[in-house]
Regions:
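N-terminal membrane topogenic signal
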Residues: 2-19, 102-106
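Transmembrane signal-anchor helices characteristic of membrane glycosylation enzymes that use polyprenol
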Residues: 12-36, 176-183
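Membrane-interface coil-to-helix junctions
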Residues: 26-69, 73-78
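Transmembrane-helix motifs of polytopic, lipid-linked glycan transferases
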Residues: 84-102, 117-119, 143-147
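Transmembrane and membrane-interface helices of multi-pass
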Residues: 108-121
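Membrane-interface helix caps and helix-loop-helix hairpins in membrane proteins
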Residues: 121-131
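Soluble catalytic regions of membrane-associated enzymes that act on cell-envelope
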Residues: 186-353, 357, 374-375, 379-393
Length: 477
């Protein structure tokens, strides 16, 4: 019986399909949210003035081509396919060289896979795709040159039989695949750390607060400022900030936001915090600051938020402006069409304008939220930020002054007072018994506080933290 041998084109196809599937799975399942972030950080438009401003010959052409491709990352399944395809194209170009240079190339195709691990090693950090496109262009040029040089001279290199055999091919291919997976997914731990940040960012953007709390554990929050802040944002949204924030290593009011940090991810978080607090002007301010950090002058994430914020505030002119800008991209035109009914509904509506007054100084979050509460006393989230911020600063005196004002607005009808506020009032009552008048304190809080007083009196403050870990008392002492 004769040995069956696969045709060369099937051999090549198997290599390409296998490499594509492995890389697609890596990107889609390991870096799903990074793909979404890449799209949000990019910007592409068909407007001629954008093209003239963006493209500086010759390097600008690659930026523009990369921006065109990145817009399709809005769909992670497509983004993962494109990321995998770039590596496959590099490998196919190398296969052309193998077929033109070597005798019996069928079992030497693994040579063509050798560049792939080095290609994917730096692929994650290539925000503009210029590196990937450069690799592809260089690979195509080299493949064409080799093809042209071997048209007349068809003399091929002959390698020893022990190299050009199936066993060596399989072992080499498995090793190359393993090296590729390692370089892309495991060599650089910061890739997975940023993937976690982008996942938290996406869940917060889409208001999936329970899912966000599921991936922001108190243990991680001890060492990771992003995890801490996103967990606090989720607690704020769910009305549980004053029942659980001290589990997440809060040490000051600045743990609720990013102060004096200009990175896009920090500005983006601040914008979402102010969105939760109902302060559209600060959402827009932080979004514009985020825009300044974009490699493209603006970004899809920025434009979408500006459009949505102005839709929420019923500012027809500005909402239409940003939606018109987005409509000139290939993918976002569908996003715009979905929101046109919402836009038309506010055409003749007077925009919501924030009350005129002293300009907020966003260098101090507690001042900002205090001012907002004065304007909107029904805003529970602002009240929680003020009170929890003062507790984080261990400023019990100002906490009580603020609580008296806030309680008259939000706890005047026998509403349950959050746990940390009760604990702070009990602590204040030691020197000022009257602070408890008119407030309902749970019996278990009263009972536990008696134990805490005994421990403190006996000089056993350290035991307070071990016996009552998630309490204001443990934090205070």
């Amino acid at each position: 019986m004769r040995n069956s041998k696969l045709p060369l084109y099937i051999h090549i196809s198997l290599y390409a399909v296998t490499m594509f599937l492995v890389l697609w799975c890596m990107w889609y399942f390991c870096y799903h949210y990074s793909l979404l972030w890449l799209e949000g950080f990019s910007y592409f438009s068909t407007l001629p003035d954008v093209l003239s401003l963006s493209v500086v010959l010759p390097e600008g052409i690659l930026d523009y081509a990369g921006a065109f491709l990145l817009q399709f990352y809005y769909y992670p399944i497509v983004g993962a396919a494109l990321q995998a395809l770039y590596a496959v194209v590099v490998m196919l170009c190398a296969m052309v060289m193998v077929m033109r240079l070597f005798d019996n190339p069928s079992h030497l195709l693994w040579f063509a896979a050798l560049p792939v691990p080095f290609f994917v090693e730096g692929q994650y950090w290539n925000y503009t795709l210029t590196r990937s496109l450069t690799w592809i262009i260089v690979s195509v040029v080299i493949a064409v040159v080799v093809y042209l040089l071997t048209i007349r001279n068809r003399r091929r290199l002959h390698l020893p039989a022990f190299i050009a055999n199936v066993a060596v091919e399989i072992v080499a291919l498995v090793a190359i695949m393993g090296f590729t997976v390692y370089n892309l997914g495991y060599k650089d731990n910061s890739c997975r750390e940023y993937e976690h940040i982008w996942k938290m960012e996406h869940l917060a953007e889409t208001r999936q607060w329970d899912a966000l709390l599921d991936i922001t554990s108190p243990d991680e929050a001890q060492v990771n400022g992003f995890v801490r802040r996103y967990a606090l944002l989720a607690l704020l949204e769910k009305g549980k900030l004053a029942d659980g924030m001290f589990l997440y290593n809060v040490t000051s009011a600045n743990d609720f936001w990013f102060k004096d940090r200009e990175e896009p991810m920090c500005r983006n978080y601040n914008a979402m915090l102010f969105r939760s607090l109902g302060v559209p002007n600060e959402v827009i301010h932080n979004t514009f600051q985020q825009q300044l950090q974009s490699n493209f002058g603006t970004s899809f994430a920025v434009l979408r938020r500006l459009a949505e914020t102005n839709l929420e505030t019923k500012n027809y002119a500005l909402a239409k402006k940003y939606m018109d800008i987005l409509s000139h991209s290939t993918v976002m035109s569908c996003w715009v069409e979905d929101r046109k009914p919402q836009l038309e509904a506010i055409r003749n509506v007077k925009p919501k304008v924030e009350v005129n007054g002293e300009q907020f100084k966003t260098s101090d979050l507690l001042e900002v939220t205090s001012e907002i509460f004065n304007l909107h006393p029904e805003n529970r989230k602002c009240a929680d930020i003020v009170l929890c911020g003062l507790l984080a600063e261990k400023n019990c005196k100002d906490f009580y002054l603020a609580f008296k004002v806030i309680a008259d607005k939000q706890y005047a009808h026998s509403e349950s007072i959050p746990r940390y506020y009760q604990e702070a009032l009990m602590l204040l009552s030691v020197n000022t018994p009257g602070v408890l008048d008119g407030y309902s304190i749970d019996s278990d809080v009263r009972s536990e506080f008696q134990d805490v007083k005994k421990l403190v009196k006996n000089g056993e403050k350290d035991r307070v933290k071990s016996l009552y870990p998630n309490t204001f008392w443990a934090y205070y002492f």
